[in-house]
Every structure is written in structure tokens, then in C-alpha cells.
Design a protein with these regions (language model features):
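N-terminal, positively charged, Ser/Thr/Ala/Gly-biased leader segments
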Residues: 1-86
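An amphipathic, basic-hydrophobic helix/alpha-beta surface used to engage anionic
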Residues: 151
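Immediate flanking context of iron-sulfur cluster ligation sites
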Residues: 141-145
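Hydrophobic side chains in well-ordered alpha-helices
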Residues: 26, 71-72, 131, 197, ...
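N-terminal glycine-rich flavin-associated loop
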Residues: 45-83, 95-140, 167-186
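Phosphate/pyrophosphate- and phosphate-bearing ligand-binding catalytic cores of soluble enzymes
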Residues: 2, 6, 40-41, 47-50, ...
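Core subunits and conserved enzymes of cellular information-processing
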Residues: 136, 147, 156-159, 164-165, ...
Length: 225
């Protein structure tokens, strides 16, 4: 992955749709809240999609804490920066021209998984395979149909991912997210308008999924592993 290099990319020269959205102050602000090593310029999206295609994102940010994520989103909203939120890049198609504005990826550090009885809560960046493995180790089953999907929890909620006759909505209890005012909200699965590869989040692309809780059942986890 590329790092910020002023010799290769002049901070004040990034242009979006003929306008200078970015200047040194804005980029320094993003680096200040997300961490300098977590802010990359002209980052090829092919490095972050399972299809391995896609041109550069003007600015690519990977917050590694929830606090850093909130501060990054706040900076983008306050400065009216074009914003795209992505997860693990599974089934994400990006054109050769890339993505204008700021791309925030949730997969780097936002991947905690907690098991409490038959409930499993996973951060948006956690991989479905890791959630299924954690559940199986706790003797829980129910994630098997979607465990092989190479995507994140956030992406699975966003599009109601499914495979082998099962879908995310089959096990989902609730989703915690930030709306476009950065208000922390929790919605039960029944209020997420989840259908075939769709959910309420597709209608609200500025909402940022933080975590999801699934309800599983006791079983022979060893058979899943």
C-alpha cells in the first residue's frame, strides 16, 4: 500500500470536478483525527476490492478506532467533502477513473467480535468468516450459509448478503450505526427493509454502520469449524 508522499502527490493539487476540495489544512485535519499512516492519497482502489480492479481514490482513510471514525466523518460532513464508505471491498466495482473525494474503509481496525450467550456482536469491519469462526468456537451455529462470503459485517448488512439459501437477515437482530448527523442509532432487523440484496442503508449512503448483533443457536460448533 502507498503512504503519503509529498514528493509524488502535492496536497494542494488534488482536484475534484474542477474544484479544489482539498488543501493542506483539510488533509492535515484528516491525518490528525484518523492518524497520518491511515490517510493515503491517490490510493488505487484495486488494492481494496476483491475484483482487483479500480482507479484511485483521491483520499483513502482507514480509521482504526471508532473515535477516529467518528472524527473522520465529522470532518467530511463539516467540510462538505464527497464521501464514500466501504468495507472489505467484496463485490465492489470501481471504474478506472476511481472515486472522487474521501473513501473511508472500515475493515482495518474496526473488527472486534463479542460473544454473549447466543448473541454475537461484531464491528462493521469484521469478516463474516471470522464471526462464524468465533461463533463456532462458542458452540453456536447459524452463520454457516454466509460464512464463506468474502465480505465484512457492515457490507453484509448493507446489501443483506446471502448464499446457499441463507441471508444476513435470517440471523440479524439489530444494527448500530451513525446517521448523517452523527447521531448514534440502533435499529432492529425488522426496521431495516431487508430484501434480496438490499436494505435501508442503500437508501441512506451517508449512514455508517458500526456494528451488528446476530442471534444464533446452540449446536455442534466443531462441525462448522
Amino acid at each position: 500500500m502507498q503512504s503519503i508522499d509529498d514528493n509524488d502527490h502535492q496536497k494542494a493539487d488534488i482536484r475534484l470536478h474542477e474544484n479544489d476540495f482539498f488543501n493542506e489544512d483539510l488533509l492535515c485535519a484528516l491525518a490528525g483525527v484518523a492518524g497520518e499512516d491511515n490517510v493515503l492519497m491517490s490510493e488505487p482502489m484495486r488494492e481494496h476490492t476483491t475484483f482487483k480492479i479500480g482507479g484511485p481514490a483521491d483520499v483513502f482513510v482507514t480509521p482504526d478506532t471508532e473515535q477516529g471514525l467518528v472524527a473522520t466523518l465529522d470532518t467530511c460532513y463539516r467540510c462538505d467533502l464527497p464521501l464514500t464508505i466501504v468495507g472489505n471491498g467484496s463485490d465492489l466495482l470501481v471504474g478506472d477513473k476511481g472515486i472522487r473525494g474521501v473513501v473511508v474503509a472500515l475493515s482495518k481496525g474496526l473488527s472486534d467480535i463479542t460473544v454473549d450467550g447466543t448473541h454475537v456482536t461484531a464491528a462493521a469491519g469484521a469478516l463474516l468468516s471470522d464471526v462464524a469462526a468465533a461463533a463456532a468456537e462458542a458452540g453456536l451455529t447459524g452463520m454457516e450459509p454466509i460464512s464463506g462470503i468474502p465480505g465484512s459485517v457492515g457490507g453484509a448488512c448493507y446489501m443483506n448478503a446471502g448464499a446457499y439459501g441463507g441471508e444476513m437477515k435470517d440471523v440479524l437482530e439489530s444494527v448500530t450505526f451513525l446517521d448523517d448527523t452523527l447521531e448514534l442509532r440502533v435499529l432492529p432487523a425488522k426496521d431495516l427493509a431487508m430484501g434480496y440484496r438490499t436494505s435501508v442503508f442503500e437508501q441512506h449512503p451517508d449512514w455508517c454502520i458500526l456494528s451488528a448483533t446476530v442471534v444464533l443457536h446452540r449446536g455442534n460448533g466443531a462441525e462448522v469449524l
